[in-house]
């Protein structure tokens, strides 16, 4: 597999050519349509951004409503609420919620989301492995900015790269030629 792409039980990791890594965790073999996404750009001081997505069940009493509060629980302790802003975009977690979840996911943890009468679970299986791989890809292992294997090493971490710019090339004297079946050029 490509160095920056991996699947770790219920978590996926994708790192792109700018050095940004995204890891997403899903429900554990149940049909709960929920995921948490953590995104971190390259660079020593880059923070981790957390987002929450709950897809519709198609059942009015179980679907999260726009404007409804979703409470996040880690090992039975409330991390506070997130307001569901839109069905078309993920809901942003606070910095405190993100840090608490990342810390909890380093070991076995239970993550639950509650709203109305509905409780959804996000799996912890594979999260620590995905975080370790993210640290490795971004060259953070044993540095203070590592998520998993923190240390005091001062080596440079992966610097953010600019997205490659693609220039469209103009073609001069364009002529359109229709090739018909049976013509010599058609068979090339």
Locations of the language-model features?
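A generic "folded-domain core" signal
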Residues: 1-188
């Amino acid at each position: 597999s490509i160095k920056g792409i991996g699947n770790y039980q219920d978590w996926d990791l994708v790192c792109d050519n700018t050095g940004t890594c995204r890891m997403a965790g899903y429900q554990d073999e149940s049909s709960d349509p929920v995921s948490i996404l953590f995104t971190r750009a390259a660079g020593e001081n880059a923070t981790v951004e957390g987002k929450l997505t709950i897809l519709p069940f198609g059942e009015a009493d179980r679907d999260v409503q726009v404007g409804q509060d979703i409470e996040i629980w880690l090992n039975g302790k409330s991390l506070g609420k997130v307001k569901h802003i839109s069905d078309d975009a993920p809901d942003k977690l606070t910095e405190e919620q993100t840090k608490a979840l990342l810390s909890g996911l380093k070991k076995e943890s239970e993550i639950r989301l509650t709203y109305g009468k509905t409780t959804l679970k996000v799996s912890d299986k594979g999260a620590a492995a995905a975080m370790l791989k993210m640290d490795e890809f971004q060259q953070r292992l044993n540095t203070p900015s590592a998520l998993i294997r923190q240390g005091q090493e001062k080596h440079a971490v992966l610097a953010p790269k600019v997205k490659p710019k693609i220039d469209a090339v103009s073609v001069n004297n364009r002529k359109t030629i229709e090739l018909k079946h049976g013509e010599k050029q058609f068979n090339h």
